[in-house]
């Protein structure tokens, strides 16, 4: 009985061991080491990753300190190479005298503390490390408007490349990051909108002199990724290295100066400001000096001048908003607007003068003879003006043509000189007088209209004497009465004719006076129109010419003739 019990117990144990062994084998087959959850298990797994081992090796606190300049011999300076790539000109703020640029910065230096053998770390020759785990130079933009780095630079990671294959210690670090710099720039807008600006980025360390950090840079700034600007054209962007000594330190400081030369594109200002201003001025000047309106009045031209002045003032304010506040010089476009305003002001004043000239017709006095000769004879030929036919007719009827009057004066002056010379010679012919046509044509015509029949020498009297011998006394008395009545009627008619002729002549002279002053104002209008249109054209062409000369002087600084 006891033997049977022992046999049963042994069989049960064998079966239990077999079952446990099978379940253990099944569990081992389904085991996945990635399912480890404990920290110790993860550390054991991560230690086998080469990149993790390399990073922990390089950044271990026992061998690397971000506060220490990464060079084994601290008596030597650490060389830092800087490259700049211009991406975009964001804004040029003339009133604030600054410029905003989007650039890509690259700083390269050698970190002698980051040393590893790629053979020990899975042939890893290069790795990426966050910037805050490594020492970086305190490179600073001296003339930055914004002081905070968070507002200007966006730091990323640093690429480390081993120098093991070069047989040297350490690693080469490349620190690439984008930046938006707003730098101060003294803008010279003397020849605006044909100006060229030179803005400089001053880059160096803020706390380390040349003995600690020695900066180098590429000569040219890369423009491969540059987005062209619609207003500015980049002429050059070069980096210059300088060494300066300051009073604080015995060692010199290395300063990198990146000079950005940009030139403004003037087409926008020509199309939107200069040409419209010239057109408005020409229209205003043409309105100033055109003939009178239908109501024979020029007073509306004063209102036109004042309105144009207001328009020019508004345009000048628009330009001044883009200019910096300076008293050192006046920009070229400001000279242009100032000249245009002066031209319009003088034109408005001279329009008042023309109105005054036109208004003198109410006084009933003709212009002086020299004025008549200049404005009625000389200037109309030059200005391609014709004397109005009514005025020419009046000159012919009144024998008052300015050219004939001048000729008569010359002939009278010559004849007087001849008479004076003849008197000195005491010639018998000196008693003779040359007939003078002092009277007008109307007076000559009037002298033949009426004949005094009572004159004893008249032919009517002679004829009346012949029959007076035959008739009787009664007939003679009747004849004498008739002749007396005729003589009185003739005298009355002569007086009436004289009064009528005088009134007609007076009306003609008043009409002549009015037409002459009106034509004088028209000649003045045409003359001033040509003068002021020429002035506007000269001012506009002068602006463009001076601007082109300024651009030429920028491109040819050695040419002294065009050096501005």
Swiss-Prot record:
Transmembrane parts of this sequence? 269-289, 302-319, 329-353, 527-547
Q: Which Pfam families match?
A: Neur_chan_LBD (PF02931), Neur_chan_memb (PF02932)
Q: Which residues form the signal peptide?
A: 1-20
Membrane topology type = Multi-pass membrane protein
Q: Which domain of life is it from?
A: Eukaryota
What spans does the record annotate as topological domain Cytoplasmic, numbered to this chain?
A: 354-526
The glycosylation sites are 25, 37, 125, 198
Q: Please give a single GO biological process term from the UniProt record.
A: regulation of programmed cell death
What's in the GO CC field?
neuron projection; plasma membrane; postsynaptic membrane; synapse; transmembrane transporter complex
PROSITE patterns associated with the record: NEUROTR_ION_CHANNEL (PS00236)
Topological domain ranges for the Extracellular compartment: 21-268
Q: Which UniProt keywords apply?
A: Cell membrane, Disulfide bond, Glycoprotein, Ion channel, Ion transport, Ligand-gated ion channel, Membrane, Postsynaptic cell membrane, Receptor, Signal, Synapse, Transmembrane, Transmembrane helix, Transport
Disulfide bond residue pairs: 185-199, 248-249
Q: Which CDD domains does the UniProt record give?
A: LGIC_ECD_nAChR, LGIC_TM_cation
Chief location category:
membrane
One molecular function GO term is:
transmembrane signaling receptor activity
Cell compartments where the protein resides: Postsynaptic cell membrane; Cell membrane
**What does the record give as the function of this protein?**
Subunit of the non-synaptic neuronal acetylcholine receptor, which may play a role in chemotaxis towards choline. After binding choline or acetylcholine, the AChR responds by an extensive change in conformation that affects all subunits and leads to opening of an ion-conducting channel across the plasma membrane.
Quaternary context: The functional receptor is a heteromer of deg-3 and des-2. Interacts with ric-3; which is required for proper receptor folding.
Which family, according to the similarity comment?
Belongs to the ligand-gated ion channel (TC 1.A.9) family. Acetylcholine receptor (TC 1.A.9.1) subfamily.
Additional notes on this entry: This locus is redundant or nonessential as suppression of deg-3 function results in wild-type revertants.
Record protein name field: Acetylcholine receptor subunit alpha-type deg-3
Point out the gene that encodes the protein. deg-3
């Amino acid at each position: 009985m006891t033997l049977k019990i022992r046999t049963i117990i042994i069989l049960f144990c064998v079966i239990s061991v077999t079952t446990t062994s099978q379940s253990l084998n099944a569990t081992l087959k389904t085991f996945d080491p990635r399912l480890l959850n404990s920290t110790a298990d993860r550390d054991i797994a991560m230690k086998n990753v080469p990149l993790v081992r390399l990073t922990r090796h390089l950044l271990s606190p026992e061998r690397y300190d971000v506060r220490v300049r990464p060079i084994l011999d601290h008596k030597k300076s650490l060389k830092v190479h800087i490259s700049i790539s211009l991406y975009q000109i964001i804004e040029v703020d003339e009133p604030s005298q600054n410029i905003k640029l989007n650039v890509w910065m690259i700083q390269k230096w050698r970190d002698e503390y980051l040393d590893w053998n790629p053979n020990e770390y899975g042939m890893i020759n290069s790795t990426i490390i966050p910037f805050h785990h490594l020492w970086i130079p305190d490179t600073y933009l001296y003339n930055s408007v914004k002081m905070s780095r968070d507002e200007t630079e966006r730091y990323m990671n640093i690429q480390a490349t081993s120098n093991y294959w070069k047989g040297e210690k350490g690693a080469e670090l490349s620190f690439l990051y984008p930046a938006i710099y707003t730098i101060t720039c003294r803008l010279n807008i003397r020849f605006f909108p044909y100006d060229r600006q030179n803005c400089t980025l001053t880059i160096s360390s803020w706390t380390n002199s040349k003995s600690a950090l020695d900066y180098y840079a590429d000569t040219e700034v890369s423009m491969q990724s540059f987005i062209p600007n619609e207003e500015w054209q980049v002429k050059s962007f070069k980096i210059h290295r300088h060494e300066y000594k300051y009073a604080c330190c015995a060692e010199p400081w290395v300063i990198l100066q990146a000079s950005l030369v940009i030139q403004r594109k003037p087409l926008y200002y020509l199309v939107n400001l200069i040409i419209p201003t010239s057109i408005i001025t020409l229209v205003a000047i043409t309105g100033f000096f055109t003939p009178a309106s239908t109501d024979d009045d020029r007073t509306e031209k004063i209102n036109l001048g004042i309105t144009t002045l207001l328009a020019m003032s508004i345009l000048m304010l628009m330009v001044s908003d883009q200019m910096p506040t300076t008293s050192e010089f006046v920009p070229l476009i400001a000279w242009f607007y100032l000249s245009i305003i002066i031209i319009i002001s003088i034109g408005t004043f001279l329009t008042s003068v023309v109105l005054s000239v036109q208004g003198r017709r109410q006084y009933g006095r003709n212009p002086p003879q020299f004025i008549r000769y200049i404005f009625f004879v000389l200037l109309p030929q030059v200005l391609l003006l014709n004397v109005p036919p009514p005025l020419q007719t009046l000159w012919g009827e009144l024998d008052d043509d300015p050219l004939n009057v001048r000729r008569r004066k010359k002939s009278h002056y010559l004849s007087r000189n001849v008479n004076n010379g003849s008197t000195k010679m005491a010639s018998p012919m000196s008693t003779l007088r040359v007939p003078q046509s002092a009277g007008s044509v109307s007076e000559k015509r009037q002298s033949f209209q009426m004949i005094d029949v009572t004159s004893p020498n008249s032919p009517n009297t002679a004829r009346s004497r012949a029959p007076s011998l035959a008739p009787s006394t009664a007939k003679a008395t009747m004849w004498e009465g008739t002749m007396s009545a005729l003589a009185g009627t003739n005298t009355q008619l002569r007086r009436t004719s004289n009064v009528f002729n005088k009134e007609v002549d007076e009306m003609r002279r008043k009409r002549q006076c009015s037409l002459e002053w009106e034509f004088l104002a028209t000649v003045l209008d045409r003359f001033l129109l040509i003068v002021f249109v020429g002035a506007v054209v000269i001012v506009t062409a002068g602006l463009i010419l001076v601007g082109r000369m300024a651009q030429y002087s920028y491109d040819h600084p050695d040419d002294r003739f065009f050096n501005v």
